């Protein structure tokens, strides 16, 4: 059995087709005609843009505009004028080929993003390498395997499935996907989920462990795959596939109903989004609001910071789309670890612990004040709440509240409407915030637990480092105690406590969160109905009894053993 990351839920049974990567050899030679080389580069870029637009159009017809925009985003990334300028300058100054110059510039850019301790932003490294590989293949005349020709019952196996590869997939022919790299936030996972194809990612060495035609069964929910299973195992997976199909039908009855436990405890079930247009998906999937709107993506892939008006329109559009439902908007979570050229930030040795999020914002008040003004103005159009990331003490919260108070005075003088009862809360994601939760709860309007970073900081682990990734788990007793303390401190002061990390949708963790008293679960739009069903199947009495046993555990293994008995 092979174990990896559960990238896209579901059961798959089929035959292996390996997507082999062509070796790209770049000659290290000098050129004499730089104009001709620049023309080659521009021709390749033009073909790349045309091909990408065509792929995005096809993808839009099959999985929708939201996922097709991942590919269109590649065009925007490449059209950053500084990138082509750097490549052209290298061709002219170093007298090197278009291939060599392109490789150097895009690999340097990719490496910057790869060092960012944020899974969503690390994905940009994969994007830039996909762009680089595709343009290099155009320049070198290399053609890839046509995924659209894969026969029915195919399990695709690849080092990674880039957005451009995924665009060619005919969903009904693909039984599953296995890759050597990638996580739940990688584009291969996002697109697999959009096409409802089960996927297991980050299986080390899978490409060399299987051969074309091998029979594979996989469980994208548990992150497991078995190559050439015996008849009994394949029959078992066939049964699981039928059960999965029935469960999907069953989930439909959880649309349009409140999120309530089996014995009547009501909680809010809201969605995480990264772009204004994602709010429509949240509505379509029956989300009860927005629990996390990541605003940093408004600041990326451009040459200047977004204006107040640009931000105002983005926040307003989400508020209006949600029609009076709560919308929690996280202020800028960006800093020295992000390659945003116009910010002029220095690269840091340890950006995970560095100049980022609220630390950056309180020093760059010119940028932060603009964002806060846009947020306060947009609050007139819906139930917007402001959330401050990476807080470690009450002084940071007080500084933000003081800035907002000053902005409100300005808007009063200008005669501009806003919500005078605008709530300002905290992203609880550091051990410092956890230890100070009793103090912070007295001054914050709400808490939202960011389990991804809280787990990393609490366990002192970089989940991107395979040697220590085993330590990264929300089921570790230390992390569970941190979560429980934050919720208890919030409840004592009567404020709402939510969770917007991946753990909020984990069916094994949900009963514990209910027992702890979590008020709000913020999940991906596609996880709404499944999470609602898990909550509906849970009784508070049973959840509390389970939590008592779990909180008596000393190790993660003990926690998992208790949960396995349920």
Question: Which functions belong to the PLM regions below?
Answer:
Residues 1-321, 327-334, 364, 368-372, ...:
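Non-catalytic, soluble scaffold/interaction modules
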Residues 248-566:
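Conserved alpha/beta-domain cores
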């Amino acid at each position: 059995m092979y174990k990896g990351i559960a990238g896209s839920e579901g059961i798959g049974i089929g035959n292996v087709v390996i997507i082999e990567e062509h070796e790209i050899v770049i000659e290290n030679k000098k050129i004499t005609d730089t104009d001709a080389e620049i023309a080659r580069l521009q021709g390749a870029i033009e073909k790349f843009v045309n091909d990408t637009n065509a792929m995005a159009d096809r993808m839009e017809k099959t999985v929708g505009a939201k996922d097709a925009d991942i590919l269109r985003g590649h065009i925007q990334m490449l059209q950053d004028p500084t990138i082509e300028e750097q490549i052209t300058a290298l061709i002219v100054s170093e007298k090197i080929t278009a291939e060599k110059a392109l490789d150097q510039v895009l690999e340097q850019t990719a490496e910057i993003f790869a060092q960012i301790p944020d899974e969503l932003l690390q994905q940009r490294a994969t994007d830039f390498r996909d762009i680089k590989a595709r343009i290099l293949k155009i320049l070198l005349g290399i053609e890839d395997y046509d995924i659209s020709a894969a026969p029915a019952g195919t399990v695709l196996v690849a080092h990674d499935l880039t957005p451009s590869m995924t665009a060619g997939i005919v969903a009904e022919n693909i039984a599953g996907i296995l890759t050597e790299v990638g996580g739940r936030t990688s584009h291969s996972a996002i697109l697999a989920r959009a096409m409802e194809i089960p996927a297991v990612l980050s299986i080390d060495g899978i490409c060399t462990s299987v051969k074309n035609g091998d029979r594979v069964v996989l469980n994208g929910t548990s992150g497991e795959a078995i190559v050439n299973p015996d008849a009994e195992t394949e029959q078992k997976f066939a049964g699981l596939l039928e059960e999965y199909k029935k469960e999907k039908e069953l989930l439909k009855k959880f649309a349009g109903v409140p999120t309530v436990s089996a014995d009547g405890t009501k909680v809010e079930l809201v969605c995480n989004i990264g772009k204004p247009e994602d709010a429509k998906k949240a509505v379509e999937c029956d989300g009860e609001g927005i629990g996390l709107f990541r605003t940093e993506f408004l600041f990326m892939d451009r040459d200047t910071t977004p204006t107040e008006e640009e931000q105002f329109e983005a926040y307003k559009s989400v508020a209006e789309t949600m029609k009076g439902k709560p919308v929690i908007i996280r202020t800028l979570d960006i800093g020295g670890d992000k390659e945003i050229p116009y910010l002029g930030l220095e690269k840091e040795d340890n950006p995970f612990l560095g100049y980022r999020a609220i630390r950056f914002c309180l020093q760059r008040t010119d940028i932060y004040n603009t964002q806060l003004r846009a947020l306060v103005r947009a609050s007139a159009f819906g139930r917007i709440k402001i959330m401050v990331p990476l807080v470690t003490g009450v002084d940071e919260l007080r500084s933000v509240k003081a800035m907002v108070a000053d902005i409100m005075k300005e808007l009063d003088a200008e005669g501009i409407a806003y919500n005078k009862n605008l709530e300002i809360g905290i992203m609880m994601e550091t051990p410092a915030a956890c230890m100070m939760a009793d103090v912070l709860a007295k001054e914050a309007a709400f808490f939202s637990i960011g389990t991804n970073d809280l787990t990393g900081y609490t366990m002192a682990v970089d989940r991107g480092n395979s040697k220590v990734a085993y330590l990264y788990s929300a089921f570790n007793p230390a992390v569970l105690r941190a979560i429980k303390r934050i919720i208890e401190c919030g409840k004592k002061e009567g404020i709402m406590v939510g969770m917007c990390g991946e753990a909020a949708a984990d069916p094994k963790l949900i009963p514990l969160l209910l027992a702890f008293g979590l008020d709000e679960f913020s999940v991906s739009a596609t996880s709404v109905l499944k999470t609602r069903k898990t909550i509906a199947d849970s009784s508070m009495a049973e959840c509390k009894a389970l939590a008592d046993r779990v909180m008596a555990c000393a190790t993660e293994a003990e926690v998992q053993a208790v949960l396995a008995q349920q």
